[in-house]
Amino acid sequence: MTMTIEHGLQLQDRRDGVGGLYTIATLGSHSALQILKGARDEGFNTLAIANRETERLYRSYAFVDEVITIDKYSDFMSLVPELEQRKIIIVPHGSFVAYLSLEDHKKMRIPYFGNKAVLDWEASRELQRQWLTRANLKLPRQFRTGAEIDRPVIVKLYGAQGGKGYMFVRDAHDFEERASLLARQNYILQEYVIGVPAYIHYFYSPLTGKLEIMSMDRRYETNVDSLGRIPSSAQAGMDIDPSYVVVGNSPLVLRESLLAEAFRMGEDVVRVSQEICGPKGLFGAFCIETIITPDTNFYVMEISARIVAGT
């Protein structure tokens, strides 16, 4: 692994945190710009750990004080001994989930914003479903085998991959014809709920005991969000498979009459987390990913126990 270090601002001893200054650090990916801009606004030093394709981007922002370049994000753990000698606080996001293992997260001794006990419940689709069920959230039906499928489903791969590899399946026969595409991959078979996607961004502070809804968004996915521009009659014979790769996020203002239920869901998710993960439970930023049906019911697809890209 090769590494370079660049200082964006020449403040006295910023890198060593002299004078009590902490540095907020994160991988240069996913939602790093939101995290580092917010950290700078709150008076912290900032550090982006980028790869060779992204280092130029992060060096171009004035609120990024320092950039460390590594060959690939999975090399992050080799930096840990150096970072442990500094006044660093890691703020994780989806790329930490994608590129580091659970064991990597747990053995890190750098101060880490978030409760690592939550990671097991987020990473396991089965445990996550137990958590959300105990919080009295409506969940789409889940199928254990392809033979059980009796309605349209979406096949979801494990991990934070921005929808990559997701697959729409009409019925059991359709699944069997395409199952070879899923060889040696972990996935779930989830009922496809028709409605409006709404990703609700929360922040829970254990210091004040208060929960906030900060924002909401919709995700733009290629190519599924462009298929509606093609008349259904024209789609016949085109042999187009919908894909769900996220390419961007758009702000969403939720109808006010739905806010009470959105808030209730967040409160109950936090409450149950304190039962299953210890008194600290889930804190900081998190996102409940929902579909809102025509009868204005929320169906929860999953939870991200951290900041998400649209926050």
Spans of model-derived segments:
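Conserved ATP-binding module of the ATP-grasp superfamily
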Residues: 138-140, 168-199, 214, 224-227, ...
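ATP-dependent carboxylate/phosphate-activation module, predominantly the ATP-grasp catalytic core
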Residues: 202-274, 304-311
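ATP-grasp fold ATP-binding core
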Residues: 132, 150-168, 185-195
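C-terminal active-site "lid" helix and adjoining low-complexity regulatory extension at the edge
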Residues: 2-5, 9-11, 16, 305-311
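Short beta-strand scaffold segments in enzyme catalytic cores
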Residues: 199-202, 289-291
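Conserved N-proximal alpha/beta basic substrate-recognition cap immediately N-terminal to
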Residues: 51-153, 161
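N-terminal basic/disordered segments at the start of proteins
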Residues: 25-48
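Conserved metal-phosphate-binding beta-hairpin within the catalytic cores
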Residues: 270-310
